[in-house]
Amino acid sequence: MPIFDEYGVLIFAGAIILLIGLAIVLPLSLKGWRRWPSWLALLVGVGIYFLVPLAQPPLQNWALGSFPSDVSFFIRTITLALLAGVLQELIKFLFLGGFRLLFSDNILWIGAMLGLGFGLGEGFYILYSIRNLTYSMPSFVFFLDRASAILLHIDLGFFLAYGFKRRITAAALPLVIVLHTASVYLGLLHVDKKISMWTAVGVGLAASFVLYLVAICYYFKDQRRPLKK
């Protein structure tokens, strides 16, 4: 019975995370749902997230081990955040580049779906990681935090795709790395008890929503704007 309870909670909470993600990305395009590359990008996004737990912890541990014992909190924390931002956005960038070569017509929607999949993969991984802590449903703030993270990954996937489409990846990639780094830094401030979880989630959700509105504006603006030759 405990196993059933544990996995019942996992399935139900995972379904909530999935519905949150789909509800967030839907306003960007209704037509995109009928195109199979969108679903492929979603599945690839989920899959490539699992490269992160393999590569990111060793990289961050190496960085921590190379610091002197008296390194400042800011240097330590911003380095960990930057490593996470660089690694995760480079993974998205490389796979999105492959999609750009294969499916160039709808790359903005594909970028958003790849970001959605990445955010869902992160949510499923975190949910599975905490499965032994409790048999009850995760708290409301947990789902708010996951909504914020999914929203951010959709935003960043879109901005990367926009960079590919408009041939400005040299600007888009550093931008998304900075935004991702800022988000991780905010979370680390909570982990180190510098700010409350509600503050971290609230600020993160507000910032992700603003970026989401920017992405929507750019998406519909792009539909009316010819590509540069």
Question: What do the predicted segments below correspond to?
Answer:
Residues 1-229:
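Hydrophobic alpha-helical segments at protein termini of multi-pass membrane proteins
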